[in-house]
A protein has these predicted regions:
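Glycine-rich FAD pyrophosphate-binding loop
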Residues: 2-19
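Short loop/edge segments at beta-strand edges and connector loops
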Residues: 8, 59, 92-94, 143-145, ...
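Dinucleotide-binding Rossmann-like beta1-alpha1 core, especially the glycine-rich loop
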Residues: 22-100, 217-219, 250, 254-257, ...
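Mid-domain beta-loop-alpha active-site segment that forms a flexible
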Residues: 112-132, 176-178, 262-269, 313-314, ...
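Helical element adjacent to the flavin cofactor pocket in flavoenzyme catalytic cores
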Residues: 113-170
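C-terminal catalytic lobe of FAD-dependent flavoproteins
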Residues: 123, 265-356
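Central helical "cap/lid" subdomain
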Residues: 165-210, 339
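Active-site lid/adjacent beta-loop-alpha segment flanking the redox-cofactor pocket in flavoenzymes
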Residues: 206-306
Length: 356
């Protein structure tokens, strides 16, 4: 019998998992083919989870285009590769895209990439459903509870936490961008960047979008409850003022005026492509610090310095969550490495640098 205890330093889905665009996809960006296949399989597992525990996922695909003609040509080649890899992807004329999303202008598009298998999820609701299912199977969920370190005694290993000492055989660090935690607990330095992802969530509005819209500079989708989710693609400007403001990785703006200014700026990007958003008001503006391993791939495996500590860090965390959960659990329980995860071990060479 396996006993599982889950701790969270604040509360579930309160950091990057809350402030994510939550696009489920196996897109052209998922390279090479083996990594793309991992994403494809995980998209399929999301369908299973939706049926098993009632995670509300809005399927319908994504529509994507770029501003420059050169980038559009490259997108056409990438979609051709996607088709060869088994994806339901195609290039549509704008008129056909308009039939799918009549409220989108498709400004600047000659044609549009349509990836029919994509979907989007409310990450907070998904996290709650997953934790409830885990608890129904006997898992303990404790928060707020921070991991301070590991104590090794004659009676075994114990997690030293702010909510007491917890005995363990194996511990999984699913800590996202908290690289200092990995360094202190796992005794490893994982080469990664971490940049802030800015997400605006609006007040509920009338049904406007059926699919994910990935337009130049901005991505947009609408949840079942009517809220529009908008993310900017370029990120914060590299100015001294912004660098100072982002020091310490804040999860919110220093004041409401600044937050509303940024929310409106991001909404204005979306309004260019969905004009009917003009009267919609922002409800939340979220800052999420994304874990970005330098080569663009997850970090999954035991620490070479602390054999009982397993690291599980991933960009594309939403898409990959179901398959990472399954495969990591299998490695932990069976105590044997799975070949499919060998490319993502913590001790690999992070040679290729991928910019997100």
């Amino acid at each position: 019998e396996v006993e599982v205890t889950i701790i969270d330093m604040q509360s579930p889905a309160s950091h990057a998992s809350l402030a994510t665009f939550a696009w489920i996809n196996a897109s052209w960006a998922k390279q090479p083919q083996a990594y793309h296949a991992l994403n494809q399989k995980s998209v399929g597992y999301w369908h299973e989870l939706s049926k098993q525990i009632g995670v509300p996922i809005k399927w319908g695909g994504s529509l994507e285009w770029f501003k420059s003609s050169d980038r559009q040509k490259k997108l056409g080649l990438q979609i051709r590769e996607q088709i060869g890899w088994g994806e339901a992807a195609e290039i549509l004329p704008v008129a056909s895209a308009k039939m799918l999303e009549p409220n989108v202008t498709f400004m600047g598009a000659d044609n549009v990439a349509y990836s029919a298998n994509d979907g989007a999820v409310d990450p907070s609701e998904a996290t709650k459903k997953l934790l409830s299912a885990a608890q129904a199977n006997g898992a303990k969920v404790i928060y707020p509870c921070n991991l301070n370190g590991i104590a090794k005694t004659l009676d075994g290993e114990f997690a030293d936490t702010t909510c007491g000492s917890i005995p363990f055989d194996q511990i999984v660090l699913a800590v996202g961008a908290a690289s200092k935690t990995i360094a202190s607990i796992a005794k490893l330095n994982i080469p990664q960047r971490s940049t802030p992802g800015i997400i605006v969530v609006t007040e509920p509005t009338e049904p406007l979008l059926n699919r994910i819209v990935v337009a130049p500079g901005v991505h947009i989708h609408q949840r079942f409850d009517g809220r529009i989710v908008v993310g900017e693609q370029t990120g914060a400007p590299k100015t001294p003022a912004h660098n100072s403001r982002l020091k310490g990785r804040p999860n919110q703006y220093p004041n409401q005026v600044l937050a509303q200014d940024h929310a409106q700026r991001i909404l204005d990007l979306a309004i260019k492509y969905v004009p009917r958003l003009t009267s919609v008001k922002a409800d939340e503006i979220l800052i999420g610090w994304r874990p970005l391993p330098l080569d663009g791939h997850p970090v999954l495996g035991y620490s070479s310095e602390e054999p009982s500590v397993y690291i599980a860090v991933s960009h594309s965390g939403i898409t990959l969550a179901p398959i990472i959960g399954r495969l990591v659990a299998k490695e932990l329980i069976e105590k044997r490495p799975l070949e499919v995860l060998n490319a993502y071990r913590p001790n690999r060479d992070f040679i290729t640098v991928v910019r997100y």
